[in-house]
Amino acid sequence: MNPQGKNKILLIEPPFYRLFHDRYSLNKYPLSLGYLAGTIRKHTDWDVMVYNADFMPKSISMRISHLSGAGFTNYRNILKNPSASIWDEVRTTILNYKPNVVGITSKTPNFESASIVARIAKEIDNKIIVITGGPHPSIMSSDILNRKEFDIGVNGEGEETMVE
């Protein structure tokens, strides 16, 4: 996908809270992706970008009651809607960066969202290598093996695997 010949990897925190409400946000840097980015930069000549798809700059405070009520309905509806604005944002980010590799961190609560992000990457360019790691793939590796949108599942700490 990258015509300039420079290898590029896009590391993604998939959306989760933003699926409950368009102004909810994960207002922290995805530290695990930061460690991966640092390791990749230190040991390779690849360009690396970290994208937190769960971050909304003008967010509001989360209400727990919303997460389990109307927000949960919204969450499920957005997972089923490929034209939702969050998926357009993910698509645009991948299209603009033009990565050779997309790495997606996944916890069990955001695994469906991570799978959608992986499918979007494959729809853009089937040659993009899609890797997933994090708690969910480490514990539930069979979920990764049963999904064609992932090329590689990383079990445990990913720093050494990503450099390889």
Task: Please describe what each predicted stretch is.
Residues 1-4:
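Basic/polar N-terminal segments that are highly enriched at the extreme N-terminus
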Residues 32, 39-40, 47, 51-57, ...:
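Glycine-rich beta-alpha loop elements in corrinoid/cobalamin-binding modules
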Residues 18-19, 72-73, 100:
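Generic signal for short, ordered secondary-structure residues
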Residues 6-28:
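Short glycine-rich His-centered loop
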Residues 20-26, 62-66, 78:
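Short, flexible/disordered intra-domain loops and linkers
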Residues 9-12, 62-67, 112-116:
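A broad, low-specificity signal for short, low-complexity segments enriched in glycine/proline
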Residues 57-73:
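N-terminal beta-loop-helix "entrance" segment that forms/cooperates
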